[in-house]
Amino acid sequence: MANPTVIKLQDGNVMPQLGLGVWQASNEEVITAIQKALEVGYRSIDTAAAYKNEEGVGKALKNASVNREELFITTKLWNDDHKRPREALLDSLKKLQLDYIDLYLMHWPVPAIDHYVEAWKGMIELQKEGLIKSIGVCNFQIHHLQRLIDETGVTPVINQIELHPLMQQRQLHAWNATHKIQTESWSPLAQGGKGVFDQKVIRDLADKYGKTPAQIVIRWHLDSGLVVIPKSVTPSRIAENFDVWDFRLDKDELGEIAKLDQGKRLGPDPDQFGG
């Protein structure tokens, strides 16, 4: 089996291409989920202040037999804290029982309030202080990203967006790549695979490779150059989602999955959300 792949970010830092998402997991659930994830080989964990499970993540990491240097921990600045990123980060660090965060992401731009440039400037300072290794954003559209770059001169290393076979965001993905911004997929299985896992192309590829539909979709993200963070608290599913290193999809197969794109957003519209 091939080793899990890593991605080099534009700031020189390296992150695993496949991580564990913990959205909607309780503090108790997240402890057992992370224990299982580390056991099967995950080294990247993606949480957020808004998930209200950073304390559980912290306990799991505290008890882990994996060295801190081997782990890649992401958390996120919530919308209410755009004017106080320092306090928000220190609160997250305390809950996570960590000295630094590998990747700190602004969770939403919230253009109705329009503090995202101010928040970004604060995140830049926190990175300079060594409290954060890398800084990025989630759910930013091209015009939000361009404004950050124009007003601060600092480009996010990551843009984590809703991305799955029904919502492929190819224009944004390409724009990110042109600006050396790594695209990361949230809700990569389209919230449990509804409308995706039953597609003929997905089922046919699952049969061909002896894999599950979820594994095919995760491999599609990986082979499309995306960082991907499938969420699960089920031990068997956590293991299944990581068992994707012994096959690859070819160009034609990726192209067939590309045809599933409907521009179908399952989550909020970033131009409207918050505020």
From Swiss-Prot:
It is found in: Cytoplasm. This is Methylglyoxal reductase DkgA. The keyword Amino-acid biosynthesis does not apply. PANTHER family: 2,5-DIKETO-D-GLUCONIC ACID REDUCTASE (PTHR43827), NADP-DEPENDENT OXIDOREDUCTASE DOMAIN-CONTAINING PROTEIN (PTHR43827:SF3). Gene3D superfamilies: NADP-dependent oxidoreductase domain. Belongs to the aldo/keto reductase family. The active site is at Y51 (proton donor). Pfam families: Aldo_ket_red. GO terms for biological process: L-ascorbic acid biosynthetic process; methylglyoxal catabolic process. Substrate binds at H107. It catalyses: hydroxyacetone + NADP(+) = methylglyoxal + NADPH + H(+); a primary alcohol + NADP(+) = an aldehyde + NADPH + H(+); 2-dehydro-L-idonate + NADP(+) = 2,5-didehydro-D-gluconate + NADPH + H(+). Monomer. Optimum pH is 7.5. NADP(+) binds at residues 187-241.
